[in-house]
Amino acid sequence: MTDVTVKSLAAEIQTPVDRLVQQFADAGMTKSASDSVTQHEKETLLAHLNRDRGNAPSKLTLQRKTRSTLNVPSTGGKSKSVQIEVRKTRTYVKRDPIEAQQAEEEEQARREAEEQAQRAAEEQVKREADLRETAEKAKRAADEQAKREAAEKAKRDVAEKEKVTNQQNENMTKPAQSEKAKREAEAAELKRKAEETARLKVEEEARRIAEEARRMAEENAGRWEAESATKPEESADYHVTTSHHAREAEDENDRQVEGERRTRTRAAKVTKQKKGNRQSESKADREEARAVTRGGKGKRKPSSLQQSFNKPVQAVNRDVVIGETVTVAELANKMAVKGSQVIKTMMRLGAMATINQVIDQETAQLVAEEMGHKVILRRENELEEAVMSDRDMGVAAEFRAPVVTIMGHVDHGKTSLLDYIRSTKVAAGEAGGITQHIGAYHVETDNGMITFLDTPGHAAFTAMRARGAQATDIVVLVVAADDGVMPQTIEAIQHAKAAQVPVVVAVNKIDKPDADPDRVKTELSQYGIMPEEWGGESQFVHVSAKAGTGIDELLNAILLQAEVLELKAVRSGMANGVVIESFLDKGRGPVATVLVREGTLNKGDIVLCGFEYGRIRAMRDELGREITSAGPSIPVEILGMSGVPAAGDEATVVRDEKKAREVALYRQGKFREVKLARQQKSKLENMFANMTEGEVSELNIVLKSDVQGSCEAISDSLQKLSTDEVKVKIVGSGVGGITETDATLAAASNAIILGFNVRADASARRVVEAESLDLRYYSVIYDLIDEVKQAMSGMLAPEYKQEIIGLAEVRDVFKSPKFGAVAGCMVTEGIVKRHNKIRVLRDNVVIYEGELESLRRFKDDVNEVRNGMECGIGVKNYNDVRPGDMIEVFETIEIKRTIA
């Protein structure tokens, strides 16, 4: 056949030329596209490709699993289901064809050698049998010959006696008999020699065949041993039935087994006869003895149903996983022991417990280790810790901008000061001119960037100020020079000290005529804020937010303090921060203001924040501009959370949204458990107090606010208004507008609806009108708290006071058929009015309290009698009036109560 080129061959088999050249190279032939290819090379390439593509696994392992359920009795009379899985593994080995052929040839040679040796042995046995038969025949012939010779001798004796008479006959017969005996002896000798020659030939042939079989077996012994080493040992019960030695060995083994069985039988009988030792025997031993000795006539019933489990001779040490709390029964189940053993161990350790008692993790660890087990402690928040620790963080820490919180008393000019720094009008936008949110802003100055947090100064915003102090690096304490130190100023100092944050004092309103900065220094020194010129650590800067005086000095003081602190943060990696403020926007959903502490917060990150989680859908700065990332010390608004997070929660970027949801749900469940436990505890503690006290009025409130911090502050302030008689109960609170659900809740709980910087939608207004609910809107927290106080005051029980208006002395007593005893009196003090309450005093002791029924002056009924005049007084339902008694006239006055 004509040789073809590689290129034409590639076109013929429809494969790329480069691939065909590579295949030739793999087969050991170096070709190019223009080289020719012979038929032999084609066959070589085809064999190479078939060998490559035909490679199948030489070993195949199959695993079979069978699952079943087993009910195991547990403590408390219950049973638990145990899943049982039985696994079977089987391996199939595919041999190489050449190796398989060689093994087959060796196996064939071995079988032929065995068959030849078997045939030789059978022929040897047959020849031995023939030899024995020939020997027996020869022996029988010799015996017959001896018998014949004896008979002939007897005949000769008889013939000698008749010798005289038969001389002629004897001389003729004797030569004939000797000739016959000679011929028979020669024939027997020839036959014996022929048999001996045949026997020698058979033995020689048997020895030759046995020698040849032994030589072949020695030649194949090495190959058989190698093959037996590679092949799995399938059976050891192989023997040659025709081998004499094998039969003897097998008979000896059978005799040994039979002897051991008889020995066990005798021992079992002796054990059964010893009744005194039955207490020390186990149930399994008695069952075995009965199984061996039953069946009197040698017929033993099969013992397939007898359990073959043996009691462990040593304790099993387990890995016991213990949670934060565990009951004694659960601990016993984990260690696979009885609960009584655990209780005994605890008693030895000095702790008394019942089987259902809950023990802590440390006690359970001591008990388990005392019983010899290995303890693995498991924390319930293990998932939370794993999620928090699985983070990508950079290693290079860089300088970051300081976070500065401006704190101080209300109306001391905090926001105005920040407003001047930002050159905007923030204070005018706040309702009432007071700050009610935490404002987070970052400001670029000539000397660097500074992030400012503006906190409220009103007393209701304590928690918001505390959060501001915890998230900050430096506190700027604003004190008005004309007002001095006020309550919220002292509270701000306490927050700063608790957070261990340095304080820079800004003495504001320095341009006012009545400003007294030295008085401010003196008052602050009483609370541990000492100026540097007095040997302290705090910088004092005189500023004016209106005129702009001292603003640059204040910024320089802040940056100087930040330089001393050496503030650093890792800029790269997954971010974490703190929630400054959060609220619910009707169009955007939950919105959280987050101050980034370290790392970079990017759009699209998965954030875990307290009880909430979510992917960041959008990010905005404090001016409302869309941004995609934020570094350390930058405040941003993020959208995309599952709910409104609580202000002050830590915001952390995590990898997996599924794990973030699990951690958030775990935190919610934990919070719910703690809340229920706290409520249960308060119920138990207040049980007897609630039984003794009277009816308590409750003012139910549904509160809605624009941001989370304001809602929290108002809730705390309202609950502090509660008294022993009127309690404020906030049945619902939240962030966002007032919805139909809020109105329905208020109608069901007979509550008033308070909206702080929010409004009700159309559906909520319809419910409010239909149910005649009390809906009020507020924008200043002062007004809200004052009106709630008024509502609580109206719910207070009225207070009554008795006021003495007159005093009369009894001079004489007259009898009247209509009124009975009538006292003639002189009014000594005040005025006596008709139908008023009176008290009768004798020796300054009240002996009667009743009502003045009749009042007369002379014979005329009058309504009142004034001081220094005489009158007649008839006391209703009382006749024991004596001269000298004093009649005290009083009236009850209702006093209107208010909430302080």
From Swiss-Prot:
It is found in: Cytoplasm. Residues 263-277 have a biased composition (Basic residues). One of its GO terms (cellular component) is cytosol. Residues 544-546 are annotated as: G5. Residues 408-415 are annotated as: G1. Residues 508-511 are annotated as: G4. The keyword Cytoplasm applies. Disulfide bonds: none annotated. Residues 454-457 are annotated as: G3. GTP binds at residues 408-415, 454-458, 508-511. Keywords: Cytoplasm, GTP-binding, Initiation factor, Nucleotide-binding, Protein biosynthesis. Residues 48-310 are annotated as: Disordered. Residues 85-98, 108-164, 177-237, 278-291 have a biased composition (Basic and acidic residues). Residues 399-568 form the tr-type G domain. InterPro entries: DNA-bd_dom_put_sf (IPR009061), EF-G-like_DII (IPR053905), EFTu-like_2 (IPR004161), IF2_assoc_dom_bac (IPR013575), IF2_II (IPR044145), IF2_N (IPR006847), P-loop_NTPase (IPR027417), Small_GTP-bd (IPR005225). Belongs to the TRAFAC class translation factor GTPase superfamily. Classic translation factor GTPase family. IF-2 subfamily. HAMAP family: IF_2_B. One of the essential components for the initiation of protein synthesis. Protects formylmethionyl-tRNA from spontaneous hydrolysis and promotes its binding to the 30S ribosomal subunits. Also involved in the hydrolysis of GTP during the formation of the 70S ribosomal complex. This is Translation initiation factor IF-2. It comes from Pectobacterium atrosepticum (strain SCRI 1043 / ATCC BAA-672) (Erwinia carotovora subsp. atroseptica).
